[in-house]
Amino acid sequence: MTATIIDGKETAKEKRGQLAKEVEELKKQGVTPGLAVILIGDDPASLSYVRGKKKAAEAMGIRFQLDHFDASFTEQELLEVIDQYNQNDDFHGILVQLPLPDHISEQAVIERISPEKDVDGFHPLNVGKMLLGEDTFLPCTPAGIVELLKKTEIDLSGKEVVVVGRSNIVGKPVGQLLLNENATVTYCHSRTADITAHTKKADILIVAVGKANFIKADQIKEGAVVIDVGVNRLDNGKLAGDVDFEEAKEKASYITPVPGGVGPMTITMLAHNTVKSAKRTIQL
């Protein structure tokens, strides 16, 4: 068996086309969706992500504003910038690019962003709504993963899902979203005694640990759906996921590649949340 590739680029392209039309409709009603991104310091990965967000947002007709400050910018100064955007009706989404320098509290920053403009879906109020299955801004990568799974037309209800990784950004929320879809969810992490015992039971295996080629084919159930969230740069400069792709694609039924799998969906769902926020201002 060779797995069917879940093409994140193609799914993202379709969704972005839809969003561009929605932006046009909003503009006809006098509302241009606006996204403010705040970047502290010069982390190369963060710079790359922000460039990707800018390009995608502008292609969909979303107003994009980047405020880039050097690494010495204080927490208080950052909170004041967030306050200004909270009050600015031209911007419907506010995103502070993570990670932040050590002297700035990520939690303080996340909680300062208005829940109505929290297009990353990280504010505790929005996380709580997600847990309850209420309508809210969903975290972008987990929401993108669910969209990709739905594109495969796999019925998620009753499936055994194993999530390797328990970060607040991907692992925890993606498990919760799939629980909301009636899947049976198991989390594995660095303290799990025997990860393979769990992964081999998974109908759907989601891996988000940030370690290149961490999961091998012998840890995967025959015919499983494999979602690889990792993006790791190897010594030769190439990108690799958290799953050994060449091995795993001979065992899985569906698999996401790296790059071109989950990544394009993350930015797409950020745009989706920004448009959703703009619609709320005119009660669409």
Swiss-Prot record:
Pfam families: THF_DHG_CYH, THF_DHG_CYH_C. Homodimer. The gene is folD. This is Bifunctional protein FolD. Keywords: Amino-acid biosynthesis, Histidine biosynthesis, Hydrolase, Methionine biosynthesis, Multifunctional enzyme, NADP, One-carbon metabolism, Oxidoreductase, Purine biosynthesis. Belongs to the tetrahydrofolate dehydrogenase/cyclohydrolase family. GO terms for cellular component: cytosol. SUPFAM superfamilies: Aminoacid dehydrogenase-like, N-terminal domain, NAD(P)-binding Rossmann-fold domains. GO terms for molecular function: methenyltetrahydrofolate cyclohydrolase activity; methylenetetrahydrofolate dehydrogenase (NADP+) activity. Pathway: One-carbon metabolism; tetrahydrofolate interconversion. NADP(+) binds at G165, R166, S167, S190, V231.
